[in-house]
Amino acid sequence: MSNATIDPQRPVGELAREVPAYTRVFEAADIDYCCGGDASLEIACKQAGVNLDDVREELADIQTDDAQAADWDNLAELVDDVVETHHQYLREELPALEGLVRKIARVHGENHPELEALQTAYLDLAPTMKEHIREEEEEVFPIIEKLDRGESLSEGERRRLREEIEEMKADHEDTAELLERIAELTDGYTIPADACPSYESMIERLDALERDTHEHVHKENNVLFVEAETKLSDGVESRNS
């Protein structure tokens, strides 16, 4: 398949939404398709320092017939997926990983002074993510589900949903910065030569946390919130017609 079939001006978030398997290519190339999903493929490649034509070839090689996106027209189903797949993972992993990060910093800190900064970054990240998913489930998702059912929203609910979506996107940016800091402190999740099995596990789980967060944020920023804002706009147009 020619790489000409992949338009370099299309936003990377839109491409990932259309073909979820593209995210494997984006992850490998360190292309930000979640918080930076509005950037065109061309711009995203420049930002990541990778060759555009090489990335287009890799994307074109993916068999899209076997990798189409799930039908997320039903936003309630997408909300359920986010909660059951990503929020539940965070509820279990964040506290467990915190204990491991503390242990590794204590045991290996003398030989790896960067672990103190890593622990600080993680202890900033974990409560932020916990509060974020609580707010989504209690404040944001109920309004989206009501909107998805076709129920009428008050002006206050419409305004609050728009404000909450912007706040959630800002939270995602803050989370991305902390994860980027963790990635830097671990040299891109490189396992040190003197790492014990627990140290190795910590690195692997931090890497997995970042990858899951990329997918999580992509589903919200580029699918759920986009569709919710479209429904809000359609509702305004319907009432004004």
Language model features with spans:
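Small-residue-biased structural context
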Residues: 1-241
